Each structure stands twice: as C-alpha cells, then as structure tokens.
Amino acid sequence: MAKQRGRKLLQKQNKDDFKHSLDQERHEEEVIQVPVDKAPAPISADGPNTFFGTLDTQELEYFKRAESTMAVDTFESADEKYQFINSVIEESKGKELKLATSQICSKLMERIILAADDQQLKAIFQGINGFFVNLSYNKYASHVVETLLVRSAALIEKELLTPVFEAELDGDEQVYASMENMFLFMLNELKPHMKMMINHQYASHVFRLLILVLSAKKLPKSTQSNSALRSKKSKIARKMVDLKDNADFDRTYRTPDSFKLELKGILVMLYKQFTNGIEPGTKHSEVNIACVTKFREYCVDKVASPVIQLIIQVEGIFDRDRSFWNLVFSNTEQNDPKEESFMEYLLSDSVGSHFLQAVIGFARTKQVERLYKLYMQDRIVKLAKRDTTGAFVIMSLLQNLGSKEVKSILDDLVPELSILLNSNLDFGSEIIEASIRQGDYKKTEIVEQLGKKYYPADSESKNILESCLQLASSTLGNTKDDWPTADERRRALFLEKLINFDDYFLEIAVESLLNLPEERIMQMCYHGVFSHVVEHVLQAKRVETVKRKLLLNILYKDAVNLACNAYGSHIMDKLWEFTAKLTLYKERIANLLLEEADKVKNSIYGRQVWKNWHLELYVRKRFDWRKKVKEQELEVFPDSKPLQPKQKESIPAKRSAPSNNQRPGSLNKKRNAEKHHT
C-alpha cells in the first residue's frame, strides 16, 4: 500500500495530537503547552509568531453564537447582559489567546471588552497577561489589545478620581491589583520589544496607543481616519468589522504621575537605542551620521513614520532639548548638504511630505523658520504645485510660521491661486484662512483671482455653482441613489468658505442660484451635500430683500416635502430666520404646513420643523405667534426702526369730508342744534 501523504493526513495527526474537550484536564494540558512564565515569546526579525492552537468545533460554535448574540444586543435588561458576559468570560478562561488570535472570535473578545464592567475587564486583562507582546504582533489580536488599552485608560482615571480602599466583593470574586499597576506590569513586558514595534504593521498601532495613553492625549475613535492612531486605509478596514466604539473613545483621560515618568523612560531608552547609547540632549553634530541616516529611514517608512511623528509630538512634555527633533534635523544655521538631500526627499515623497507636514505643527517656530529659510523660501510656488507632496508642507507653513513669513508666502502664492486651485481646493481654503489670520491680508487680490476663475466677467453663461460645484458631472438628480462623492463634499465646503469670506461671493451665489431652473434648485435642496450650499446662502442679514423674495417664491412651493426630508428640513429651519420682516411669506409657509399637518407630524423631520416654526402656537394662539415673529425680527435686525406714524404738517386745517357712516347734511344739523342750544 502506498504511503499516505498530504494535508488531510497532517490535519488528522494534528487533530489526534491536539484533541480538545470541555473538561478541566484539557484546560490543564493547554496551560502546560504554553506556560506564561516558562515559555517566553520567541522573537524574530518580524516579531513573535506564537501559535496558541485552535478551538474545537463545539467551542467554535459556542463562541460564534455568543458573538452573534452580542452583535444583535437584544438583552431585556442590563443584568441579563451582565450575566451573559460573565458566562462567556468564564467559558473563555484559558482560551483567551486562542480567541484573540482568531479572525472570528477576536470580534467577540472586543465586544466583551467594550461591554465589560471593571472586574470583568481586569479578569480579561489578567487572562492575557504575559502575552501582550505576542498579541500586539498579531493581525487580529492587536485590535483586541487596542480596545483593552482604551478601556483600561478609562478605568485608570476612574480609580484615580474615586479610589476604593476596601472593596466589597461578592462570593468567590477575585481580588485584582489596581489598573495602574496592571498597566505598568504590561509596560515592563513590552519595553524590550518597543523599538521593533515601531515599524511593525500591527504592533505599531498598539505602540502609538500606548504613547497616547501615557501622555494623556486624546484617544481617537477606531474608525477616525488620519488620526494619531489610524490611517485612512486602516479606518476603512476597521469599519468593515461592524464594531461600534463605546463612550470611552474620542476623549482625553487623566493619568497618574507614574505614567509621565514611564513615558520619559521609554523615550530615553529609545533614543539611546537609536544612537548607540548617546544621552538625550546631545547636539545633532555629535551623533554618528550612520545613526542619523538610519533614524531618517524610519521617518519615511510608511509604518514607522506615524510613530516617529507621535514621539516628536510628545517629547516636549519633559524634554526641552527636543532630542528626537534634533536627531532628524540639524540645529546649525548653515545649509547641511545631507540634510538638504533629506529635505528634498521629504518634499517629493508622499510619506515624507506627510511626516514633514505633521512635525512642523509640533515644532517651535524658530525650528520651522530655519527649515523654511534654508530649504523652501526661494521655491514656494514650485513646491505648492506638487499636489500630492510639497503642497501639504506649504499649507502647514502657512499655519505655523510667523506673520512676516506667512505674508511673504501669500505674496508668492496669491498671483498663482487660480492655477493652484485646479488640482488642490484645500490650498485655496488654507490661503483664505491665512489671509483672515493676517487681518485680511491680500483679500482684494484673492477675491479678484477667485472671481476670475469661478465667475468670469466676460462669460455669458457664468455661474459659480456650475463652475465651483461642477453640477453637470455631479450626482445631482441621479435616480440611482448614489452617495455624494468626497470631491463634491470638498467643493461644497470650499464654496461655503468663499461665501463666508466676502459678500461678493454670496451675491454671485444667490444670482447663480436664481439663474438655475427651478427643478435644478429643488434637486439641490434634496441632495446630501449641495443642500448645505443652499442652506448657507439663506442669510437674512446679508441678502437683499428683493433677492430674498425671489428665492422664497421658489422654495415655499414645496415647503411640505422639504419639511419631511432629511436634508430639506434643515433648509426649512433656515427659512424661519430667512423670512424675518417678510411676514407674508412666513404666514404663507405656515399655512402650507398646516394644510398637511398630518403628513408633517408623521415625519420625524417634519415634527422638528413643526416645532421650530412654533406651529402649535400658530394654531392655538395666533396673536402670541405673531408676537414671537416680531421678537425674532428685532433679534435679526436690531438696528431697524419700526414704522412711525406720519407727523402732522402745520398747515391750515381743511374741511374734512364726511365719513362713510355719516349721512350728508348730518354735520350741518349738528352745528345748527349746537347754535340753537346756545
């Protein structure tokens, strides 16, 4: 008989070797296989790659059902949910590492961590103690560790603000150390591997979160893009998991003093590792050039770069010398050839430009001015035309340089503004913001440049909505329920910024809106992005009364449908103020809503419009509603004077004609009667 071979035989052998059951003996065997204190994680160039085994069929089915139950979250009470979580934690004891490294069950671990109470959280933390390094390097387990760290930060703050000296425990409930001590114990486990974590695909995220917790910085949401924790790509992948953060995310936590000391010690340790033992605070010129070159490679590495950015951001908390900044950049006033070539790479590389853009925001103004004057001052326009690289650095310079340098950059960029906007709308927004910060510097020239681009005087078909928003090629009017694109959102925000910047843009936006067909205007009102532009145009104080009436003549006709729409309802709310001192239009809209009151009240959006328009008052106490309208008019137009009665002129009184209810000749009879009486 031929010798058996292949994957099926290997699977059978593995099954025989690692046969699982649900009894206590199996649990003891698992502990013997990978003991915490006897089997340190094997470290390779790619990090530890420990295999913790797999769950058997029964266990896998149980945890799958538990994950589905947690995802649906249809528990009748908080106590029922607590008991369920407790039972899952009990069943997972001894299997935490298998669960965390499983693609399916790691989601269950995260859900349990997010919903666990303080004792349950500590139990989970204790269960994976000693294996944080291994889990941090795993694709799925690293997310579990991140979620655990955020919840731990919240618990550390809670214990810090409300210390409990004698905890009352129920039954066999285990006594745990404080969360601070458990966290510090975990740090000691991770410290020997931190340099390697910096440029690891998964462990780098854990390390970044550690720095944020230790420095008491804001912990961003797990699905927030371009944050200190996640890239845009990572955010999209995270959203696919269908896990929602709890209230512990997206906020800052107070931390004990020991955390600052730990952070300082970690950064000192890393600096010495990168410089072959040199103490922090050493001048750039005294560090071995090979060490500088190696560290600069980390700065432009797509994985390590965000970590280095974060290190440079937090080092100023306790290091006045900014050792890591001075490791990257020289501190001399002369041009350094090697630094110049490094700067050129940063300004032309996508990862490098994002690194330079970020660290410029963290550095001292003096350090930024040095880089600007030595390597960028003479070629601002050239760098600004590098749409995906240098342009972002120039925008960062506009935000962080001194007034003199910013004005110099504006002098160079404003004449080229219309060209720069062809590929980078964000550049236009940043130039406008810089002009405002410098007291409307170059405002006239900016308005002129933007006017030529989006509303040319010599064009008969000029329309800023078409030229700026590109309505013709947009999703406006699509019947496929297409989502608005990111480009449409960017263009809409830019036009709103222009409208805020100068009245000229509001004026031409209103004119352009009125020049569109009514059907097109209403399509904009129901669009997820362009409705915000229409809403932004409706400014009662800045739009002429005649133009306000023309816009209202179009919008009021579909008031009921607008009120019942997610986007149109915001426009209806804006019309309440936009109709100030135009009471006839206000009452006309109120009557239209009143005629279809049932439809409006049955809509979640319509009910809000009904409330904001005070229509209950309009129905029951019309006089009080009109009084509220008058109060609003005084609030919107405080300088306007109420109509005054005409002053009587000092001229001889003329004989008045008889009133309508007075018969002819009655006045003479009255006079004769008075004379007869006399």
Curated annotation (Swiss-Prot):
Subcellular location as annotated: Nucleus, Nucleolus
Compositional bias segments (type: Basic residues): 1-10, 668-678
Main location: nucleus
Protein name (Swiss-Prot/TrEMBL): Nucleolar protein 9
Family classification: Belongs to the NOP9 family.
BP GO terms, sorted: endonucleolytic cleavage in 5'-ETS of tricistronic rRNA transcript (SSU-rRNA, 5.8S rRNA, LSU-rRNA); endonucleolytic cleavage in ITS1 to separate SSU-rRNA from 5.8S rRNA and LSU-rRNA from tricistronic rRNA transcript (SSU-rRNA, 5.8S rRNA, LSU-rRNA); endonucleolytic cleavage to generate mature 5'-end of SSU-rRNA from (SSU-rRNA, 5.8S rRNA, LSU-rRNA); ribosomal small subunit export from nucleus
SMART domains cross-referenced by the UniProt entry: Pumilio
GO cellular component, one term: nucleolus
Pfam families per record: PUF_NOP9
Source superkingdom: Eukaryota
Keywords on record: Nucleus, Repeat, Ribosome biogenesis, rRNA processing
Biased composition (Basic and acidic residues): 13-30
Keyword Ribonucleoprotein (UniProt): no
Repeat (Pumilio) residue spans along the chain: 91-126, 127-162, 189-224, 288-326, 338-373, 375-411, 515-552, 553-591
General function of this protein: RNA-binding nucleolar protein required for pre-rRNA processing. Involved in production of 18S rRNA and assembly of small ribosomal subunit.
Molecular function, one GO term: RNA binding
